[in-house]
Amino acid sequence: MQEYLSPAFYLTPPLDTRTPNIIYINPSDQRSNLELFTTLSHEGFPGHLYQTIFFGNTEPSDIRYLITSSGYIEGWATYIESYGYQYASNYLDDNDGSDYVCLTWLNRSINLCIYSLLDIGIHYYGWSQDEAARLLKLFGITNTNAISEIYQYIVETPANYLKYCWGYPVSYTHLTLPTT
């Protein structure tokens, strides 16, 4: 099953016990230390795991567990992941390492945006694989196997990347707006 699972995910605990809190890291997905650190930030503390425990400790009504906003949930975790990159960068002594970490986060952000644009194109405008390939070509992605794989994944998982890409600024704006 490893080849079909996400690189990592947090298993939300049952409503009646709130435990166990499990983070799964797919061993078939090779990760650098930086990617592992930011993944654990996203999935664990202070990402999904923290968000779930904090929410549970507010003792919400049961219906609030059933009605959720995946955009807000993934937006929060992506917001936290961005801080994971910044945190890692702060602990590097050399500028090249810090620049690499910054570039890695920017690349991740751009990929989320590209995949979200593809999702809108495919599922709203009905783009074919050739039309999706035109967008990918603008970003230097021309390998036909890669294009086919990206296209097929987005076809099979509608709106998956939108909750990360568009949920992130919603979470960020909510957390940074001054209160009056």
Predicted ranges, named:
Residues 173-179:
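Conserved small/polar residues in nucleotide/adenosyl-binding loops
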Residues 1-54, 70:
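Active-site-adjacent "gating/activation" loops or surface patches in catalytic cores
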Residues 30, 40, 67, 71, ...:
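Soluble non-cytosolic domains of exported or imported proteins
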Residues 149-165, 169:
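Active-site-proximal helix/loop microenvironment
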Residues 52-53, 63-97, 115-117:
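Post-HExxH zinc-binding segment in Zn-dependent metallohydrolases
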Residues 42, 77, 167:
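Hydrophobic, well-ordered secondary-structure elements that form the walls
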Residues 86-155:
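Long, amphipathic alpha-helical stalk/connector segments used for oligomerization, subunit docking
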Residues 43-47, 53-57, 62-71, 110, ...:
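Active/binding-pocket-proximal capping segment
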